[in-house]
């Protein structure tokens, strides 16, 4: 699958855009996930500030704190086919904080978070240990495919 079969609507909804990964980076990271699919894939990637992420986490998950990534799968109406998988929302401040706290290169952690969020759109989860182990293994494999050596484990809020 070529990268042009993965379409990303990149929304930059944060005040400070300096140092963010560019569209091409997100495109390559997401394309690595979907390289086994032989169909067109579309998703929205929205980068937000901590205030918006806090609100989204509270509104949708009833958690009164911000988080690093949220995923919102799209389910088309019955009988309708759509290449749209859903939305991945990433919090700039939390991802940058985690990167520094864990001493992980910024690009590596951004790649990890978009991969993590995209896997949620495909139905992967980490609610129970068995699912978490599988999801982390898939994340590591994709990160290696993207040229990153390790995958840090990030506590999910």
Curated annotation (Swiss-Prot):
Its cofactor is Zn(2+). Zn(2+) binds at residues 116, 120, 126. Its EC number is 3.1.-.-. One of its GO terms (molecular function) is metalloendopeptidase activity. Single strand-specific metallo-endoribonuclease involved in late-stage 70S ribosome quality control and in maturation of the 3' terminus of the 16S rRNA. It comes from the Bacteria. Coiled coil: none annotated. One of its GO terms (biological process) is rRNA processing. One of its GO terms (cellular component) is cytoplasm. This is Endoribonuclease YbeY. The keyword Zinc applies. InterPro entries: MetalPrtase_cat_dom_sf_prd, YbeY, YbeY_CS. It comes from Blochmanniella pennsylvanica (strain BPEN). The keyword Nuclease applies. It is an enzyme of class 3 (hydrolase). It holds the Pfam family YbeY. Binds 1 zinc ion. Belongs to the endoribonuclease YbeY family. Keywords: Cytoplasm, Endonuclease, Hydrolase, Metal-binding, Nuclease, Ribosome biogenesis, rRNA processing, Zinc. It is found in: Cytoplasm.
């Amino acid at each position: 699958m070529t990268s042009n079969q993965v379409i990303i609507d990149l929304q930059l909804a944060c005040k400070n855009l300096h140092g963010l990964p560019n569209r091409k980076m997100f495109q390559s990271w997401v394309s690595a996930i979907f390289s086994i699919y032989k169909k067109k894939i579309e998703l929205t990637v929205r980068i937000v500030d901590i205030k918006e992420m806090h609100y989204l986490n509270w509104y949708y998950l009833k958690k009164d704190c911000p988080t690093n990534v949220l995923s919102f799968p799209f389910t088309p109406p019955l009988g309708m086919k759509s290449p749209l998988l859903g939305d991945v929302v990433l919090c700039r401040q939390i991802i940058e904080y985690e990167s520094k706290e864990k001493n992980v290169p910024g690009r590596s952690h951004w790649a990890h978070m978009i991969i993590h969020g995209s896997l949620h759109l495909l139905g992967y989860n980490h609610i129970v240990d068995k699912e978490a182990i599988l999801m982390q293994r898939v994340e590591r494999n994709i990160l290696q495919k993207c040229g990153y050596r390790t995958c840090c484990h990030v506590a999910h809020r």
